[in-house]
């Protein structure tokens, strides 16, 4: 999600450029942007991170060094949602949940590397991928979560999707399995007033559709997070949003991570011919207490032990 709502200022400018008939709408949207900035805080705090090697059994993460072996290298690219901004613990971060899930169900040693940066747009993701290729070899698997900041920056829908496709294609050309969580639905953020929220929703849906087509064409696997999770955000906002009412909460991240994990697991196991060992509860899977249904409020989240880095010596 973007660090601050700039949707109205950009959108108002776009509307104003189409003619004086939109002057009233422009003034309204600018006013709403001013209000949104007073209730949506900037993202100053660094999200928790626990990069390293994960193994079956839910034990503490092992800090990776050159002498530490691993079977599958997983990289996370994208914006604040990819970093897990708003999470209180590393065990709530999407990358950690996905890495633990892969370790549990494949029995492989999963190395997690997070390249995502808070506030990134599709342009930023291209930079993340560029930097990765400079530093070292590409991963075996990549997860990208991107789109919201392209909406707030009023980046073009087509160019944003094409930049994402270029990143996916580069990773796929080097043998990586790529799963993309497409643009979230900004229309669920009640801190953004109407009609600004409706405009954000419309552009977000358009971008998600364009991303889906572009990612498929580039050989990646798109996961429509906005479409799949928006109903839950609308039904349970007090549970799905973090304290800033803007970024996802730990249960929301868990749902997103589960969707991405399933897509990545299927694609990765097909590529590497890895047998799957189903577990009763995947790391990060939201579980319901008796009396709750799948569509009612989730009461708790089953989590493994905290991801504490273990020195490997040397």
From Swiss-Prot:
The keyword Mitochondrion does not apply. Its EC number is 3.1.-.-, 3.1.1.6. Residues 293-306 have a biased composition (Basic residues). Induction: Induced under acidic conditions. Residues 1-21 form the signal peptide. The active site is at residues 80, 244, 247. It comes from the Bacteria. Belongs to the 'GDSL' lipolytic enzyme family. This is GDSL-like esterase Rv1075c. It comes from Mycobacterium tuberculosis (strain ATCC 25618 / H37Rv).
């Amino acid at each position: 999600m973007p660090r601050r709502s700039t949707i109205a200022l950009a959108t108002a400018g776009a509307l104003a450029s189409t003619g004086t008939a939109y002057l009233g709408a422009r003034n309204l949207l600018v006013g709403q942007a001013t209000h949104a900035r007073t209730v949506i805080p900037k993202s100053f705090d660094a999200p928790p991170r626990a990069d390293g090697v994960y193994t079956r059994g839910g034990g503490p993460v092992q800090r990776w060094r050159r002498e530490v072996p691993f079977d599958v290298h997983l990289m996370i690219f994208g914006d604040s949602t990819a970093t897990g901004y708003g999470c209180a613990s590393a065990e709530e971060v999407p990358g950690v949940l996905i890495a633990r899930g892969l370790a549990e169900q494949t029995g492989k040693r999963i190395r997690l590397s997070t390249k995502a940066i808070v506030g990134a747009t599709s342009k930023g993701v291209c930079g993340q991928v560029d930097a990765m290729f400079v530093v070292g070899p590409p991963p075996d698997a990549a997860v990208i979560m991107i789109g919201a900041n392209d909406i707030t920056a009023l980046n073009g829908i087509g160019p944003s999707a094409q930049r994402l496709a270029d990143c996916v294609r580069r990773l796929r050309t080097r043998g990586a399995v790529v799963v993309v969580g497409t643009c979230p639905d900004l229309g669920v953020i009640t801190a953004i007033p109407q009609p600004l929220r409706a405009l954000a929703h419309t552009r977000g849906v358009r971008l998600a559709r364009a991303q889906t087509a572009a990612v498929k064409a580039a050989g990646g696997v798109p996961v429509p997070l906005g479409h799949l999770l928006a109903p839950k955000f609308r039904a349970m906002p007090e549970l799905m949003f973090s304290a800033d009412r803007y970024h996802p909460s730990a249960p929301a991240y868990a749902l997103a991570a589960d969707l991405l994990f399933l897509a990545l697991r299927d694609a990765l196991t097909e590529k590497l011919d890895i047998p799957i060992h189903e577990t009763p509860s995947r790391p990060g899977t939201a579980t319901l207490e008796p009396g709750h249904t799948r569509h009612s409020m989730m009461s708790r989240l089953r989590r493994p032990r905290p991801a504490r880095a273990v020195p490997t010596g040397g």
